[in-house]
Amino acid sequence: MEKFVAVAGNIGVGKTTLVQKLCDILNWTPFYEPESDNPYLPDFYKDMQTWAFQSQVFFLTRRLRAHKNLCSHTGSVIQDRSVYEDAEIFAHNLYRQRQIAERDYQTYRELYQALVEFLPPPDLVLYIKASVPTLQKRIKLRGRDYEEEIDPAYLKQLNVLYDSWTEEFDLCPVLTIPGDDLDFVANNGHLDLIIKKVQEKLTGKEVVVFTEQEMNNS
């Protein structure tokens, strides 16, 4: 594997689209989220407190397997949502909502931390940061009915967890993409700017930011 970039961000922020566009231009290989055939999901939606732990362990094992397969690839790769987000964002949120019991959550964390130690980390995490109104707009545009019912308060809470996680994450550099200001779907100049910043970060530049002037001129 040459370069390994993971794209992170809230529901509907545009992770998959950015992965597709970066791979098309950079000629890298995309690794998308594993298809969800979680056998616990029907039970989970009926009774979250009973089935949250089992459901999250299933998702974690799928994500770990996908991460392992990715690391055996010979070329450069871009991953759509990382294994870290399962634990640090979604399982953590269920715990905060008291849908996972303390004992189960601590067991889950120990399992996650023990396994992650053996995984090669990305060279770079791209965090697409966007406000709830931007997320709602993009969710509506992609037209998934079940997503349009998502409570804005839920998206807000996930944003809080994403901000906290990316601030503390130290396994590799994190480049924050201002999703409210950059429309990499409709504006090729914005996409070019993102690629420029990604390449700067991957070549070792320590401080890489998106300035207002650059964004306005793109």
Report the location of each language-model feature.
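NTP-dependent small-molecule kinase module
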Residues: 140-149, 153-218
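Conserved substrate/cofactor phosphate-moiety recognition/catalytic segment
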Residues: 24-62
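Post-Walker A alpha-helix
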Residues: 18-19
